[in-house]
Amino acid sequence: MVKAILGYDIEPGMTVEEYERWLREEHLPDLKRIPGLRRVVFNTVKGIVRGETTFYRIAELHYDHMAAFERAAKWRAQNPVSFKRGPEGKTAFRFYVVCETEEIEFDV
């Protein structure tokens, strides 16, 4: 599995309520259209253990493999969303990385 992992804050001037409404009513339906995107996970940050960097949220976009991510990236470049629907002016990205995932489960 491959995950695109994004850390971000909400742009100044936008309330949490406005952001969440935009995210769920406009942005999520657009994400759902992306070929190969299997799952989206939102991790709302409640505290920082080390360092001073803060984030509103860490998001994960799940793909089956790197080729699926690359096809999705190409599709997104060919099918851009409008400014109103896209994250510009709403989402202040702090990082955006693509990771190959290894999950280890423990018996409890």
Give the positions of each predicted feature:
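Macromolecular interaction modules
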Residues: M1-V108
